[in-house]
Amino acid sequence: MEPPSAEELGRFWHEDMIWYGPAPIGATYTIPRYIKQHTGPFRRGLGGKTFHGHKVRFAEGNFACFFGWPNLSNRNIGGFLGLPAGGTADMQVVDVYCRRGDKLSENWVLIDIPWWLKQQGLDVFQRTSEILNPAE
């Protein structure tokens, strides 16, 4: 699935938008970089997406938030976060948006990446424990 075009996103986002993603994904500034650095890899590396809906939605002033546990299931078809193809996994996601005028200007996205990686067979906490506390 190809990412949306800059024109499509420009209907809802300011050109100088900022997207703050979790550590392995990073942050992006401007619509073209958002497409290149996040939306493109996310759509090309993950297939079979199933949205489970939002469990909570709330807003106040210029801010809105939603989350779901899980909110999205997908299949790692290879390349996402540098990983080879893997199985289906759930993503636990929190999205917080800020609006400036009639368009979105910022988006903070929290994804429980360690949980997603564990479902792909990589337990980063166990691996870190093994590195820091090697068996004698």
Regions found by a protein language model. Give the residues of each.
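C-terminal and inter-domain tail/linker signature
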Residues: 1-136
